[in-house]
Amino acid sequence: LKDYVDDDGEGSEYGLYGIPDVPDDEKTPVTIVTGFLGAGKTTLVNYILKEQREMKIAVIENEFGAVSIDTDLVSENVQQNEDIITMENGCVCCTVRGDLLRTLIDFLDKRKTFDCILLETTGIADPSPIVETFNQDLDVKVNYRVDSVLCMVDAKNIVRQLNRKPTEARAVNEAAQQLAFADTVVINKTDLVTPEELTFVKDRIHSVNAFAKVMQTEKVRVVLGLCWD
């Protein structure tokens, strides 16, 4: 952040100690997508990439080999640079092999080439340390903002997942953690449950998180304006 500090080492008009006071609308928005394996996270990411053609989206995945982007989104002359793949519509996808913070820092030079970031987590990931990553480094903090934490749930299996006994190290299980941390919940595969079961699912979700916006869909086809600003 040396560009934000005066020559005499004093803080500039950007803020105390030279830390820039960057408005949120000038930071790259990040949507974190959580949810158990099979809930539809990757399908949602692919759907957004296909439907939001006017936006340049960077996708960060934990396991690119296991949860791949649809091949029809990748151009024939695909550009590859280590774990970064550039798609035909200008979007990019990269894999986190280790440190998410390092990946975000590496993206700083590229961030002005895309409009937003979709960060897809593994199925058992606790979202709280992922969100905290955006506060651990000053460069990351002034260049990115967590816009939304979106939790995908499988209508058929979420109640069973919520009923699982947590490990000794956790007060609640992974499904409850993901729901509790979300500001948007998408109930997927609603065609696989009865109306009564769906009502029960919604009640269970609200018992964990009464403040999240809850949407429902059959095959991840959602109104993008409601979950993707």
Question: What is each of the regions a protein language model found here?
Answer:
Residues K2-D6, E174-D229:
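C-terminal accessory "lid"/substrate-recognition subdomains
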Residues D3-T34, A39, T43-N173:
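Nucleotide-state-sensitive switch-loop elements of NTP-binding domains
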